[in-house]
């Protein structure tokens, strides 16, 4: 079995990186896999070997960044076999002894797709953060840094953290991870959903192809509490025209943006300025002032009753006596009794009431000389008569007002000039 080269070069020196008697069987729980896929070097084991080689690269970066004299491990090529990858996995376990074996076993369990190939491998013990951008040319893959362990208060995530990876690629100066930002400043962190894993798979070959166009939204200079009624404004998502991946933006950030006209940007009714309420008051006052003159005109014009005739004067005088004699309270029945008694009167008795009626008419004519019964009973006829008079005078009546419109002046004639 080929071993990893140490600083001196011998494979059988007995170093701690890979011993021939310590081999781990990573497929002891994969009983559902076929023997054909297990024996083929081009099948899932090749993808597994590439993922394990990326772990060795991370261990090299950890040793170089911490200043610890590394063992000088070098990778011969990306197309190594499965036995060498098993030795490298054992090396990574020795370099990171604090990782639990259960999390490594869960991370190395890759689900089978319908085509039989591994679409992606999810590592529950890593967050796959890239703290620094690549320093070499565009054609080389960046050297990954050691993975950050999950903090004791955070549950292990089953989906790779995509937003922190984008942030470190896009910013020229490295900034702390968004996990720390969310704890210090209270910035809302996007939720990781399992459906992202089916569309964006992270492998050792696709780590260097992520675009540099996505950044974490920075909090405002003066953060506002949600109780004041205003929402924080986040920058609109912008992406390069040739970017293969869109920017990840949580729906709550888009809904909370302070865009005018958006339903989420409508303030609470309690903080609406009083100027809007004051603008409505003059309009209500105008409506009231327009309705008041009409009511005043109708109230000023008293209803003039017609003078009473002889029978009405008799009824006015005898009604109280009839009500006292009879037990009936209905007005119609009382009027019938009064009518019978009126016709039973003699001519001399009726002449007395006729004389009273004549005097009543004379008094009414003196009080109201121009009065006519049509003022009380002919309102519809009076309206039609007013319309007829206005039509004969030539005035044009407006449909919404009571005043006649002025005749439109003819437009002046403009002479045409030929150019």
Swiss-Prot record:
Keyword flag Nuclease: no
GO biological process, one term: embryonic digestive tract morphogenesis
Gene deletion effect: Aberrant expression of Vgamma2 T-cell receptor in alpha-beta T-cells. Reduced frequency of DN1d cells, a subset of DN1 precursor thymocytes. Decreased number of natural killer receptor-positive lymphoid tissue inducer T-cells. Increased expression of Il17 in Vgamma1.1 and Vgamma2 gamma-delta T-cells. Loss of Lef1 expression in Vgamma1.1 and Vgamma2 gamma-delta T-cells. Loss of Cd27 expression in Il17a expressing gamma-delta T-cells. Double knockout of Sox13 and Tcf7/Tcf1 show a reduced number of DN1d cells.
Main location: nucleus
Span(s) of short sequence motif Nuclear localization signal: 379-385
Comp. bias regions, Basic and acidic residues: 35-50, 86-109
GO cellular component, one term: nucleoplasm
UniProt keyword Cell membrane present: no
Location in the cell: Nucleus
Biased composition (Gly residues): 1-12
GO molecular function: DNA binding; DNA-binding transcription factor activity; DNA-binding transcription repressor activity; DNA-binding transcription repressor activity, RNA polymerase II-specific; RNA polymerase II cis-regulatory region sequence-specific DNA binding
Family label: Belongs to the TCF/LEF family.
Subunit organization: Binds the armadillo repeat of CTNNB1 and forms a stable complex. Binds TLE5, TLE1, TLE2, TLE3 and TLE4. Interacts with MLLT11. Interacts with DAZAP2.
Function: Transcriptional activator involved in T-cell lymphocyte differentiation. Necessary for the survival of CD4(+) CD8(+) immature thymocytes. Isoforms lacking the N-terminal CTNNB1 binding domain cannot fulfill this role. Binds to the T-lymphocyte-specific enhancer element (5'-WWCAAAG-3') found in the promoter of the CD3E gene. Represses expression of the T-cell receptor gamma gene in alpha-beta T-cell lineages. Inhibits the developmental program of IL17A effector gamma-delta T-cell subsets via regulating the transcription of T-cell lineage effector proteins.
Noted disease: Defects in Tcf7 may allow the formation of epithelial tumors.
Name used for this protein in its record: Transcription factor 7
Gene that encodes it: Tcf7
